[in-house]
Amino acid sequence: DSDPSRGLGDVYKRQILHRIKPVEGRLEKIGKLKNNSRVILDYAHTPDALKSAFLNLKEQFPNNNINLVFGCGGERDFKKRIMMGKIAEKYSNKIYLTDDNPRNENPSKIRKDIKKGIKKSNIYEISNRKKAIEEAIKNLNTGDLLLVAGRGHEKVQDYGKRKILLSDKKVILQSINSKNKFLSKNFKLNIINCL
């Protein structure tokens, strides 16, 4: 009987629930496209967090393909890279392997380490994170999910002495907008061709 909501009316509970905002960058549903595909942003940068994100999405969307954009940070937990690759392979349909925050480490070496855990052929290696996200969204099929993992709410990509302003969320929103314009244009063309 230690339920803190005990005695609160259902209407009041619903009002409270509507005010609760999700944590930025944690399984954050950024947008839904006109072809019913969705893009989710998550800070998952460890094997456990990545697996948990996949399992959560599989539970919510059991019949949808899940594609993944991710990389691993530099100068951190070298051993986790192969494990992250194995998890990506097990739970995703397409993998867009890209840079995370390489810091002072060679980004291509980081990607090479991750690929040791991936055996499937549907892996696209695009070092430029912005381009990787754009490409992944451009290639979303009807009902697909895209999980963009690793950096969450971060606004700066760390290349050691070089820092790049990069918000995964902004890139996602811009790419969704472009994809939706493309889908609308194609829908109109299809209607005209059917007449």
Predicted feature locations:
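Short, small-residue-biased leader/transition segments that mark boundaries at the very start
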Residues: D1-Y12
